[in-house]
């Protein structure tokens, strides 16, 4: 493979064996595609805003004389860009403008149009998605998590014998629409069929059929076959259908007309008997009279002569009834064919319990069930039933639901109306009865063919439709009220309900979540998350084991490893690496097509439904050079089972071994050697890693690090190829290659870097360039690293030298022993940025003021504030320091005589304000790195606000000038080249300014035209930049739009540097987590023969029981990788010949039998030098999951690095110098510092707030709460007999109010006694008992 210039800086050695047929798709595409589908108008109107508008419009007035029609919509430009929105705390959104047409009909002449008015109407703001798939809502980045919900359609299920005490299996069917009422059919223990609507009380199922205009006769005709009997001359003949006799016991001799007996009475009829009967061609059979008695009639019988009904359908036949029928002239009698085995009498029985006899009665019955207590009228009952399943406004199956419905009940087409039809309801009942009869299976609701993904776009569309429907009602009212001649569309529409619905969804829906921004991985994983919770989904409490379990259809679609531990396990999942959603919202995964035993490179995406029909080989099946299977029998999957089949039976093959797992799990090297429980912890803990000060690429990775860092959007990736012409810490400028330019543009790309900003988790986001001026750049190259990336590779932690051995009990129970060197080198130091804000409001007593003049505060406390009362940038502050001085007016208080006297003398009114300054919270120390001041429109800006504004303007001006200068240089450069080619003197041209340069005249017309084009381009550029700057200036100087009652907001940003310390939590990538117990001086750490100490000591007992052996293999491989780097460093120090260095690097890349080809010979000398420089710290290695390095490859690497093949080393005790008695596994492991820092958790309460009712101290660090002295702690003190301590704990230290105050007074007076009284919680208990009506009184003894 050919590497670009920047990829050659450091190449990761890959141990993957399988060729990569398909690159990992863009990781955020689910989110971006879904939202694009929502915003971009689509011609069919199937989805997005277009679909919402078309479903609600046109809105007709009640009279029908006017209607409001929808024409089109457009989305305007956002006012602020993403960064400005984050700083100002506003939503990144754009206005939605809709073109509407009001059509008014002529009342006098119906059908003629009187007036048409068209107008563009504002319909609120629509939040926009950023390039990285997030939304900025009120200044914070949020992610809308996709939801996995039950697909609309029809489902057949059974209760597995749990409902009825007899254990009988009861079957049920449920029609779930996308919106509208649910329709359930269910059997009871007596085999009657019932219907429920919206889970209300059940009615016999025949009621809904009657309401659909079916008579009893029709119903029996639909659900039963008939058996016809003919009664002639006292004989009863049955029309014979031989196959129906099978399995029955003959109640009489079955014989032909000539007397040949086929089956004797009492014998069971077998298939052989039936064959003989069919061969004979017998059509009728004489049966005894008893055989027909008890049969059920299939239709109504009427006496033709009198017109009276002799018998009704579903009546049971008796001898008397039979005689009457014959008398009335009915010699042929149709009865229902009922058979216990495969054709039960369910509908017949149901009709017997159904009390209704006409359509109206059925409708009334349904109305009573839906609206109990309301008097039913014919029209109301009719309208209610019509609206339930047959009205487009109230009921929609959606295209997905219709497709699923049709395929399940066996229709030929995929499409159809969104509402139900009579036939649909009958089909569902037919399938349910067939399943009860033993034909067909019930559905598996956990199958991914029955669960679909609902992404951002779809949820936003639903929410938007809700808003539109609210508006629709109001528009109808207004259309029928007003004088339509004077009204415009704008007067009819109120945008408030729409923007309220959208805002509510983005701001407070359960699926709109605060983005997890610890590191790039946590961002990507959050956007790829799939939740079964949320509106219309499951709840934690109701979700059983089956829903949470890994299902066979998860393969390649949902990761079986990555899911949270705890109550949400299995309900929140992650998308697999290659998975995507199809048009219907079902998850698909790619497979390579196999033709006649040869695996092709053609890739098909299959959904869970399609996959079941095929035979699919695993990705690790052995293939020959020509892509044929090596083995005769191949492990494969077919119809949800794992099995072995022949090579010619294979139809598809997995694309990649990593296809099964999610991105986070694919980052774990040697995953195949870890137990799944630990791998789960590993993938979850990588998301909690805090970006370290200096990112360090993992020595042992999996090869997916680069893709993930690029796709996450934290790095800066080149949009087009070119050459770096300028580069500093905040900007990179690339001069684009001629062939990649758009004709007529300057051809310069400017990338601005993000510097030291705060993430959602208070970690630090900072980008640093990785390129230098003059370097060539290819499209897709990484130009700048973000947090937790190193030369474009994801780098969540640090490579530390680890030894597995016990060390004086300091690594007991997963504790971790760390060397002081790690602290000194700042290997695990992180920067955290906190935002504190001070708000000045308008109160009833007057407005709050931000000032440095604060009552009762000494000079020293104000030392870090400027004259406006705001802390200066760069100040180092600790807890309790004032950051922003603020005073609040306080109500008039009763003055003491002394104060009155002072007032009278000095006339001062200053004491009627109280100090409400913003102070640094407890246990925080840091440096102020930024201050932002926001002032309400119309409020005068203070000095500090003006300074901030001036600085922002200065920076903006400088930025724009630099950008303009760069682009100008590009244009002028091309103009000079043009003029020089035309014979102008280069030196003279250098003296000309832009104006003169571009107004030269040339002899050749085409050249002149080109120069004029450049001049026009230059003018355009200048105008554009002037406009841009003016825009920016306006945004900076205008007042801010603050919440009602807020005059000013000051935001202060503190940066805190946190070194690693005992109590911090660390982890590897294999679920091996622990807390640092102590940090040991370097000289006391174990060291090897060369005197190199280890950085970290882990307990070997943590490995065997947890079965995460991957960490041991990683340690060995890390040692080899580092060793090879050290050898390269030695060669460079000794200044060896370049060809030796080249040969060694080549040898390192050629170890093992991998797919990777690195053509070291084609590298230039400079490239080799640069590569070697970057490999000094160790040769980075990729060992992909399920396709990684084998044991002997690790041993070969160790050998090349000059280490023993065992990977074990002799160590010496740092304190005594004695050798440890056996060799120790030493190597390099990638360790992460997790965002569970002791600084954030350590807390002690002195005096603080109490709970209002119980008067006990509050709990938790945020409330400055106390530690709960619980039940078990009380037992412990009881066991020690420490009565006084216990009394103190339960009274004065907790909720004895009088005792507390007395105790305080005593301490102040130096009288160390305590007088415990009655705890307040006893009073609460008394009140609670009294509330039950039991009076308790305490008596003094």
Curated annotation (Swiss-Prot):
Keywords in UniProt for this one?
DNA-directed RNA polymerase, Nucleotidyltransferase, Transcription, Transferase
Any one Gene Ontology molecular-function term assigned to this protein's record: DNA binding
Gene Ontology biological-process entries: DNA-templated transcription
Q: Name one Pfam family in it.
A: RNA_pol_Rpb2_2
Record keyword Nucleotidyltransferase present? yes
Catalytic activity from the UniProt record = RNA(n) + a ribonucleoside 5'-triphosphate = RNA(n+1) + diphosphate
Matching entries from SUPFAM superfamilies are given as: beta and beta-prime subunits of DNA dependent RNA-polymerase (SSF64484)
* InterPro entries in UniProt: DNA-dir_RNA_pol_bsu_ext_1_sf, DNA-dir_RNA_pol_bsu_external_1, DNA-dir_RNA_pol_su2, DNA-dir_RNAP_su2_dom, DNA-dir_RNAP_su2_hyb_sf, RNA_pol_bsu_bac, RNA_pol_bsu_CS, RNA_pol_bsu_protrusion
Give the enzyme's main class according to its UniProt record, as a single word.
transferase
> For this protein, what is the EC number?
2.7.7.6
Q: Per the record, what is one GO cellular component?
A: DNA-directed RNA polymerase complex
| Keyword Transcription among UniProt keywords | yes
The record's family statement is: Belongs to the RNA polymerase beta chain family.
Task: Give the record's subunit note.
Answer: The RNAP catalytic core consists of 2 alpha, 1 beta, 1 beta' and 1 omega subunit. When a sigma factor is associated with the core the holoenzyme is formed, which can initiate transcription.
Q: What role is this protein assigned?
A: DNA-dependent RNA polymerase catalyzes the transcription of DNA into RNA using the four ribonucleoside triphosphates as substrates.
Q: What is this protein called?
A: DNA-directed RNA polymerase subunit beta
